[in-house]
């Protein structure tokens, strides 16, 4: 987000005391010089960490990092909406065809970055 620096934007606060002797009119309580907006981005998945290798799913897994194959490491989502690295999950399903988190039968919903 861009910084807001359009001169002096003023904000007048109303008195919380409710007394009749409070200041009114054009008296400024403070002047806002600069404002840095901050935003958060959220995924549509329950967890953003691969439960098998404990690395964030949008980063390459440990094996792909060690073999320098970061671009080949993609994310796989199950019908249970849990996400893992595809290479981690492909090894997992050879031993156990269930989701490591919820133990439902593993069915691939989609694969991609």
Curated annotation (Swiss-Prot):
Task: Provide the Gene Ontology terms for cellular component.
Answer: Cul5-RING ubiquitin ligase complex; cytoplasm; cytosol; nucleoplasm; nucleus
Gene3D superfamilies (UniProt xref):
Zinc/RING finger domain, C3HC4 (zinc finger)
Q: What is its EC number?
A: 2.3.2.27, 2.3.2.32
Family annotation (SUPFAM superfamilies): RING/U-box (SSF57850)
Which cysteines bridge via disulfide bonds?
none
What does the entry list as the binding residues for Zn(2+) 3?
61, 64, 73, 87
Reading the lineage from the top rank, the first entry is Eukaryota
Q: In which tissues is it expressed?
A: Expressed in heart, liver, skeletal muscle and pancreas. At very low levels expressed in brain, placenta and lung.
Protein transport listed as a keyword:
no
User: Where N-acetylalanine occurs along the chain?
Assistant: 2
> Matching Pfam families, A to Z?
zf-rbx1 (PF12678)
Keyword Acetylation part of the UniProt annotation: yes
Record keywords, A-Z:
Acetylation, Cytoplasm, Metal-binding, Nucleus, Phosphoprotein, Transferase, Ubl conjugation pathway, Zinc, Zinc-finger
Region spans: Disordered: 1-26
Question: Belongs to which family?
Answer: Belongs to the RING-box family.
Function noted in UniProt: Catalytic component of multiple cullin-5-RING E3 ubiquitin-protein ligase complexes (ECS complexes), which mediate the ubiquitination and subsequent proteasomal degradation of target proteins. It is thereby involved in various biological processes, such as cell cycle progression, signal transduction and transcription. The functional specificity of the E3 ubiquitin-protein ligase ECS complexes depend on the variable SOCS box-containing substrate recognition component.
Extract the PANTHER family matched here: RING BOX
Subunit details:
Catalytic component of multiple cullin-5-RING E3 ubiquitin-protein ligase complexes (ECS complexes, also named CRL5 complexes) composed of CUL5, Elongin BC (ELOB and ELOC), RNF7/RBX2 and a variable SOCS box domain-containing protein as substrate-specific recognition component. Also interacts (with lower preference) with CUL1, CUL2, CUL3, CUL4A and CUL4B; additional evidence is however required to confirm this result in vivo. Interacts with UBE2F. Interacts with CSNK2B, the interaction is not affected by phosphorylation by CK2. (Microbial infection) Following infection by HIV-1 virus, component of a cullin-5-RING E3 ubiquitin-protein ligase complex (ECS complex) hijacked by the HIV-1 Vif protein.
Q: What is this protein called?
A: RING-box protein 2
Question: What taxonomic classification does the UniProt entry list for its organism?
Answer: Eukaryota, Metazoa, Chordata, Craniata, Vertebrata
């Amino acid at each position: 987000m861009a910084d807001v620096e359009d001169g002096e934007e003023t904000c007048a606060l109303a008195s919380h005391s409710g007394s009749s002797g409070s200041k009114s009119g054009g008296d400024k309580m403070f002047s806002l010089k600069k404002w840095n907006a901050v935003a958060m981005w959220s995924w549509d998945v329950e967890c953003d960490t691969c439960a098998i290798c404990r690395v964030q799913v949008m980063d390459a897994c440990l094996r792909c990092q060690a073999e320098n194959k970061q671009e080949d490491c993609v994310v796989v989502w199950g019908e249970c909406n849990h996400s893992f690295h595809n290479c981690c999950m492909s090894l997992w399903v050879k031993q156990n065809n269930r989701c490591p988190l919820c133990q439902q039968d593993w069915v691939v919903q989609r694969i991609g970055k």
